[in-house]
Amino acid sequence: MQLLNTLLIGITAGSIYSLMAIAFVLVWRSTRVINFAQAGMALLSTYFGYEAVTRIGSFWVALPIAMLGGAIFSALVEVILMRVLVKHSSSGPIAGVAPIIATLGLLGLIRSVIAMIWGGQDLRIPPPVSNNGFTVNGEVLVFSPLKLLILITTLILMALLTLLFQRTNLGLSLRASAYAPEIARLSGIRVDLIRNLGWPLAGAAGAVAGVFQTVNGNGNFSPDSIEFLLLLVSGFIAAVIGGLDSLLGAVIGGLFLGVVISFVLMYLSGGLFFIAPFVLLLLVLFIRPQGIIGAKAERHA
């Protein structure tokens, strides 16, 4: 039973990592930028969700509001900041690096603004369903209705986004705008508008990750919550492990990372918690640099 519980703990944590990894993939696929501000956006969206829960009293209304808030904020970041940086950093000594550096600065700025508006105290979002484990043959599992909800939500979101990218003209335009923007413009695609769509989608996915990260713990969060920085690191590593161009890879990478960390904590040492993800990342990069599922983008451009 301990083995099963360890696996289920890893799957639940991995589902949340997958949601954050999906956000990284969406931004990368649309604008070829690594958005390290994603944790700050997820944290801000969680505050939006908190305000909705406090005022309306329904988690099921608060979650879409958090997603909408995250989507709008992410779109504004792309239009006001990232689009200008990408355009003006196409050449020079830090070509291509300036947008990434900017996202790190934006992460700190978001957390500071949140502290100014809401203060530094812990706030709480109660879980929407029970977090008491299911009972099987008289044994209580750690897997609960809440953890099942997190897993199902991750899979549904991945499926919907995959359909969007693979089965619609909009998805084709998003991919073309990322890989070959000049050719896409010559084909009549409004590249700037299309690129902007990847950011709000990522903001919505990150919002779900932030809210679920909160309710899957003790429900408390603050501007200094270490959980969101851990979510940032885990989500990025999961995206790289799975392949930065693959939504399916993001989900597989997140689940794989979650399970590995869970087994390391249970059977090896808690001190390896921060080391294991990076060791796993290096192993994957050595063996398969494009990730488990990731395609070689240049070949398919």
Protein language model regions, located:
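Inter-helical junctions in multi-pass inner-membrane proteins, predominant
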Residues: Q2-I9, L164-Q166, G198-A239, L268-G271
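Membrane-embedded helix boundary and interhelical linker motif in transport proteins
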Residues: S30-I80, N220-S222
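Alpha-helical transmembrane segments within multi-pass membrane transporters and channels
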Residues: G57-L106, V113, I252-L257, I261, ...
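Transmembrane helix-bundle core of multi-pass membrane transporters
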Residues: L85, I94-R167, I194-L197, F263, ...
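Pore- or pathway-lining transmembrane helices of multi-pass membrane proteins that form conduits
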Residues: V86-I114, E227-V240, S269-R288
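Membrane-helix/interface signature in polytopic inner-membrane proteins
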Residues: L160-W199
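Cytosolic-side transmembrane-helix boundaries in multi-pass membrane proteins
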Residues: Y179, L186, R190-L193, Y267-A301
